Swiss-Prot record:
Family to which this protein belongs: Belongs to the HpnE family.
Task performed by this protein: Involved in the biosynthesis of the hopanoid precursor squalene (SQ) from farnesyl diphosphate (FPP). Catalyzes the third (last) step, the reduction of hydroxysqualene (HSQ) to SQ.
Identification of the protein by name: Hydroxysqualene dehydroxylase
Lineage, broadest ranks: Bacteria, Pseudomonadati, Pseudomonadota, Alphaproteobacteria, Sphingomonadales
Highest taxon of the lineage: Bacteria
EC number, as in UniProt: 1.17.8.1
Species name: Zymomonas mobilis subsp. mobilis (strain ATCC 31821 / ZM4 / CP4)
Amino acid sequence: MSVTHIIGAGLAGLSAAVAITHAGGRVKIYEASAMAGGRARSYHDKKLGIEIDNGNHMLLSGNHSAKTYLKRIGAEHRFKSPKEAAFSFCDLSDKERFTIKLSNGPLPWWVLCAKSRVPHSKAKDYLALLSLLLADHNTKIGDLVPDNTALWRKLLDPFFVSVLNTPAREGAACLAAAVIRETLMKGGKACIPRIAYPNLASSFIDPALDYLKARGVEVDFRNRLRQIHFSGQDVASLEFAHQDVKLGKGDKVIIALPAWVVQSLIPDIETPDKYQAIINAHFLMKPTAAMPHIMGVVGGTADWIFTFENRISVTISAANHLLALEKEELVKRIWDDIQTVYAFKQDMPEWQVVTEKRATFEATVEQNNRRPPAVTAWNNLFLAGNWVRTGLPATIESAIRSGQTAADLALSHS
């Protein structure tokens, strides 16, 4: 039986491996680092003495590719979710607190109810979202949606920053539209937030590794791909740090590596080349029962606050503008946000900051148009990763979907 060689054990690579194995195919997985997960990894932090995630990732119940993946690896239950699509916010500029409650069905009745929609917004303001659905690949969000409304400042701006990891006005409108189609337009039942619990590895990574191991597949860790050797229109062999792998007849290769690594391996490939950072801060503190598990922050340094059993974690998206700030000053600002949002005052506990400088490609029109498809110029070589042309921004859903797409292509090419 032919083998599909998967390079990279992040979510895209694991998704591809699970899909091919589920279909009865054979895979081999290679990973340059000592652990799987890529950006969706968990590890023991020596400073805090606990397991933390390198980032906080929020799924929505309508993320169907993630749902398929989690069902296959038996991890659907390893999440915390509210019973309804309700999102709590605190606006630090005016201390206003509000909750957005979406209607269960596809008809947006919540927009007609003043108590459910954004404070000071009007129902007609939401019509601006419809213009996004007609956007082409060369239109920015800022070209279509006015930024002088309460709706923009209190909801749309933070929402688009979170899903695109890019300043909202500069974001590609077609990517925002794709998210809206798959979530908001399907109603509240598709928008229930799902948070990996107790951490990312226990939900997305470890169950996948267990699933694969039970079927005879293990990851070859600490084995970096150094070069791809081509012969005509096919990959002939793979040169790794510790071995050379010659491809047999019918063998395939899926490259599930970061875009900047792929550029060094595949000739003449165009990929996104501008990136945005994500900063996550973790505070060693047991939250009270009154603290919501997820809280959006408007007008502060923090974007989202998440509470876990032994820590409070904060995520800041599109964080390039904060990279030059001293870490102590950054943490002070974040802690001030937490104290204001949760209305308490105490000394800052032990903390840790995790910065991903190239967390995602910049989801602008220019960068989105640089995304390559999963197919390549070579018959047996396919791409996976949240930076590949999935139609979605660089999210967990995009990464998992890209792996499933690459798997389908590998399985269908004889």
